[in-house]
Amino acid sequence: MVKLAEYPRTATFSWSHDRVPVLATGPASGAIDADFSSTSTLELWSLLSFDGSKPSGSVVADGKFNDLDWSGDDKIIAGALENGVVEFFDPKALKSVAKIHKHQGPVKTLKFNAKQNNVLVSGGTQGEIFVWDSNKIGSSDYSPFSAGISNTPIDEVSSLSWNQSLAHVFASASSSGYASVWDLKAKKQVLHLNHSSSTTGIKVPLTVVDWHPTSSTIIATASSSDTEPLVLTWDLRNAHVPLKVLSQGHSKGVLSLDWCKQDENLLLSSGRDNTSVLWNPQEGSILTQFAPRGNWVFKSKFAPEAPDLFASASFDSKIVVQTLQNLSNTLDAQANESKQHASEDEFWNNVTSNSVDDKPNTVKIQAPKWYGNKSPAAQWAFGGKLVRISDDGKGVSVVKPCISGLEKNQLFDESLKSKDFVKLINKRLSQKINATNEDDWNLLENLSMDGTALYLKDALSLDDAKEDIIKKSEEDGADFFNQLNDKFVPEGAFKLDFSESMKPLTNFLIKGDLKSALNQALEKDLLLEALVIAITSNDALLADKAKNAYFSKHSEQSGLARTLFSVAQRDVEDIVTNIDVSQWKDAVQFIFNYTKEDISKKNSLLVKLGDRLLHEGNRKDAILLYLSGQSLESIASIWLKEFPELENQLTSQKDTLYEAHLECLTEFVERFTVLSDYLDKGTVKLTNQTLISKFLEFVNVTAANGDFELSLRFLETLPDDNEEVKSEKQRVLIASGKTSTTRSTERTANSTLQSRQGRYGSTSVPTANGAPRLSNSGIPPPNPLAAPHQPPASTAPNVVPRKPSFVPQTTSAIPTPNPYAPAAVNQQIPLSVVGSRPSYTPPVNPYAQTATSIPPNPYAPLPVAAPVPLGSPVAPPPISGASGYSGQTPHLHDKPIDGWNDLPSVSKEKPTRAKAVNTAPIGMSTPSYGTPDLAAVPLSRASTNSTLPPPPPNVRRTPKLTSPPEVASPPLPLKKTNSYAPTVSAVQSSQMPQQISNPLMPPASPNPATNGRSFVPPVNPYSPAPSAVTPTGIVPPKALVAAIPSPVPAPKAAAVPPPRKMNRKSTAVGDASAASNLLSSIQTKPTPPIHSPAMVDPVAVQYDQSAVSPTNVEIAAEQGAGITESDRPIVEFLTAELQRVTPLIPQEYTKQLKDCDKRIKILIKHLEHHDLLTQPTIDKLHQIVAFWKEGNYSEAMTIHQDLSANHSSEAGNWLTGIKRLMNIAEATSSQ
C-alpha cells in the first residue's frame, strides 16, 4: 500500500470516471469542522495537485451530506443532504443546478444507474425510495416517482446499488435488517434477503448491499452488527442460503462495500473497527487487511477507471487515497528488529517521538485481473506511432495520433531552418508565463530588431544627460587649452625659498639631487611638488614612489584617487570589484576603454561585474553584461534556476503536471536557442551538464514524437564525448533510418573503389600535409560517400556565378598516361573552378603542366585529360549546380559568406550581352613557393540536371524597420570602361579571382593592406578592358600572389575583337576608374572559421554605415503619402500621442520612448506599403485607437492581447511599441 494523497476533511466522497480521477467531497452529516463552521461546501480534489491542502474547485451546498455520487458521464454530481434535499451540481461550471426537496426526512443514500447516466435512485429515513431523471430536474414542476410497493418493513434506507446488467433492477438495504431487490418495470419489491446467525440464531441486520460487476444474479451484503460483522454473497436463484460467508475480517460492524468493476475477485469493505479489508469473494478469503485508522472508516471505494487506487473516509478527519499494491521491503524488518534489540532506556527516551507507521497485513498475494489481460491489439512504438491490429485480425496498421501537448513544433522547426525567429518571439510574447519571462523575450525581440552589437551599444551606453555633460566638458577643455600659450615663460624677479621648512628641499634641487628632493617633498606632504619632481627626473622608480604616496594618502577618501589608480595601473580590476553597483555603466565604459587589446579579459570582467549585479538583485542588467561578455553559460544558469518557478506557474494553466513540464521545457529550449543564434550564430557547444540534460530531455521527447530531424539538429550541439548523447544520437539515427543507409552506401562505394584500383592499378598515397594525393593515374580518389552522378537531363547551360567552395587537389608531376585507359573526353568543369563562360581564347603555355580532371561519375573509367591544341573548337562549358567529384568532401559553410552575391549600389546602364565565343581549355599554372601547383580541369560538353543550391542568407544583422524580409533588387549593370572592349556584365564582374578555399585548411585571412580599399591602376582607353572572367587555369589566392612574387610571369591573355552587333558608347577615362573601384568593392571576402566567430565589441566598435540595409531609413513624422484616408487616423493619433508624452516622462525613460518611436515607425511603414497587415488587424487597430481616445485603456489592452494571440504572424515588432506607448500614455493621462 502506497499513500498517494491525504485530504484533511471529515466528509463523504465520490470518484469521477476519468482515467486520472478527481475526488468530490462533502462535509459528513453530524461532523463538526475544526473551525466550528456550519457552512457546507462541495469540493473537488485533483490527485495531480502540488498542494493537497487546497481543493481545485468548490461550490457552496444547501446542507451537509450523507452521501455523494457522480454520474457515469461525469456531468452531474448528486448529493444526499441531511435536510431532505437532493442537490445536483455541475462539476465543470462549479455551480448548483437544482435543489429538490422530496423526502420527508434526511436523505441517507443515493446512486446513479450503471446503464443510464441520467437515472438516479435515492433513499431516506422513513422507507422512502425515489427514482429521479436528471434530464428533467431543471423543470420547476418536476417530481421524482416512487420505486413501488414493499413486501417487507423498511425503516431507514442505508444502502442502494444498481444491477450492473439490468438497468431496471436495483437493491436496497435498511435498518430493518432486510436486503430487498426491486424491479422498476413491475414497480415493486420482487425479492428480499435475510440471514440468521448460525451460533445464536439471532437475525443479522443486512445494512449494506452491492451488486456483482458482471453477473445479474449475484449480490453481496454486509452486517453492521458488532457481534456478527459478516460479509455475505448471494445467488438470487437460491436466495435462502448465502453463497459465501466472509468472516474473520472485521471485529466490528461493516459500514461499506465496493465490488471492483474490473475484477470480480476483489471486494473492499470497511467498518467500525477502523480498518479496510480486501477480499476474494469468490473464494471467501482475505487478501489484505489495511492499517487501522484513528476512527470508524465509514466509506471505501475503488476509482472506477483506475482500480489500482481506492479512497477511504474516516471520522478521524482524513480522506486517504492509496494503492492496492503493497511495496514490501527489508527496511521494515530491519527497523522492527532494531526496536526489539533496543535497551529499555532507548525505548522510553524515543517512545514519544516514534511515529505510528502501521503497515498493511498481506495474507495472500493475488494479482489483479487487469494485470494479466494486457491486450496485444495496440502497442505504442518509438516516434509517437501506434501499431494496431485490424478489426479482422489479418492486418496491422501504423498510425501517428495527434496528442494534445505533443504536437510537432512546426513554428520552431521552420524558424531554425530559416534563421528567422520573429514569429516565434511574437508567439512567446503573447503567451508569456510571468513578467521575468516576458523581459527575456523582449530582450530577444530587441536583438532580432537591432542586432546584437547595435542593441548592446545602446543599452550599455551612458544616459543622455551624462553624455551631454561629458561632451560639454570636452568642448570646454578644448577651449581652455586653446587659450593657453604653448610654453610657460617665467617673468619678473623672485627669491629662493630658504625658509626653515623649505631650505633642505631648495638645497637638494640646487644640487640636482632629485631623489633626495623627492623624499624631502614627501616628508613635508608636498605631493604636487613631488609629482613635478618625479616627472622632471624621467626616473620610473621616482615616479612610482610619488604616485604610491599620492594613492596611499587619498585613495581611502577620494573616489577620484581610486579612479586614477586604475588608470595609472591600466587595470580596471579594482573598478569592477569595488565600484558601487549603481555606477555599473561607468564601469562598463572603463572595461571597454582599457581592455581593447585583450578580448578574453574584457569578457571575464564583464561577467564578473554581471555577477555583482545579479547578487544585488539586478537580473535584467546582469543578463546584458553576460550577453556583452559572450557568456551563454551564465545566462543559462539563471534560466535553469528559474525553471522550477516557471513550471509551477504553468501548472495552473495546464491539465497535468507533465503538460506543464513539457511546455516549460520547450519554452526554455526555444529561448536558449534563439539567444545562442543571435550571440554566436548557433555554433555554441554546450558544456554545462544541467543544460545538457535539459536538451537531452527535449531531444528525447521530440524524437519520441517522430520529429527526428529536429532531434538530430539539437544533438549536433551536444558534446560527442557524453555517453548519453552518443546513445541518444544512435537511437535517433536508427529510428530515422539514416545509419543503415549510410553504411550501405559506404560499403558499395568502398567495393567499387577496390575493384577500380585492382583493374587500373591506381593507388592513393597520403601527402605530407594530410591532403589526399592523386593516384598513379593522376586522378584523385573519389569520395566514397558522395552521391552518384546523375545523367544530364538537358544540354542548355545555366550560367549562374558562384563563389568556389572547394578546389580539387592536383599533382605537381606530369602524370603517366595509362595505356589501358579509354581515350580522354572532355568532362564537365567543376563550378568551383570556373565561375562563368569565358569570352576569349587564351594562348597555350607549352611549358605548363598538364592538369587532370575529376570525373563526375565515380563508377566510370577515369580518363586523363590532355591539353587541347590552340584554336580547337570547343563548346563553352555548361555551368550547373553540380560539379565533378573531388578527392575530398566539399567544405560546406554553416555561415553565409559576406559578399556572395553583393550588388552594385549605383545604377548603371544595362549592357548588351555579347555572343559566346568558342574557347579551348588551356592548362595554365602559376608557380608559387611552398604551395602545390594548381592546374585547370578540362571542359565537357555534357551537362547535368542538378541545380545550384540557393545562396546563403546574409548574416549581417542590421536594424530593420519592417517585420517581413525584403527582396533584394536585381543586379545593376556596370558602365563600360572602353569603347573598344567587350561589355562587362554585372554577373561577370562578380567573378573576379577569388581565394581558393581548401576544406582541409582554415581560410586565409584577408590582406590588411587592401582591406576596405582597392588599388586602381592607370587606365588606357585604347586597351582591351580587363575581363572579369576567371581564366580556365586556377589562379592562386590573392594573399599568396601579393606576398610571394612569381619567378615565371603568367602568360598574357590575347585581346579578342568585340563581337558583332555590339552597342558601343564612348566614355571618359574617369568612368574606367569608377568602374574599377566598383569592381573592387563588390569582391567577396573570405569568411572566418565557423567555430571561431569574431568577438564584436558592442560599444567600442565603429559601425559601417554602408552596411545598413535600405529599409533602415528614418521615417519623417509627416511622411505618409501611401497611407489610405481610412488608415490615416491611426498614424495621426499615434504620432500625436508620442509628441504629447515626450515632455512628460522622466529622464530615465527616454530610451523606452525612443524604442516606442522606432516601433511605431515600423507600423507606419507597413501602412504605407500596404504589406503584412490584413484588414482584420487594421480594424482592431482602429478599435484600439477608439478606446484609447476615450481613456478606456483596459478595453484597448484587451484588443491588444487578442492581436498578440491570434494575429502573431502580423503582430511584429510594432505591436510591442503600441503596448509600451499605451502604458506611458495611461501613466501620463492625468498630467
UniProtKB/Swiss-Prot annotation:
Residues 737-767, 976-998 have a biased composition (Polar residues). GO terms for molecular function: structural molecule activity. This is Protein transport protein SEC31. Its main location: membrane. Gene3D superfamilies: 1.25.40.980, 2.20.25.400, 6.10.140.1600, Functional domain of the splicing factor Prp18, YVTN repeat-like/Quinoprotein amine dehydrogenase. One of its GO terms (cellular component) is endoplasmic reticulum membrane. WD repeats lie at residues 6-46, 60-99, 102-142, 152-192, 201-244, 249-289, 292-332, 379-399. It comes from the Eukaryota. The gene is SEC31. The COPII coat is composed of at least 5 proteins: the SEC23/24 complex, the SEC13/31 complex, and the protein SAR1. SEC13 and SEC31 make a 2:2 tetramer that forms the edge element of the COPII outer coat. The tetramer self-assembles in multiple copies to form the complete polyhedral cage. Interacts (via WD 8) with SEC13.
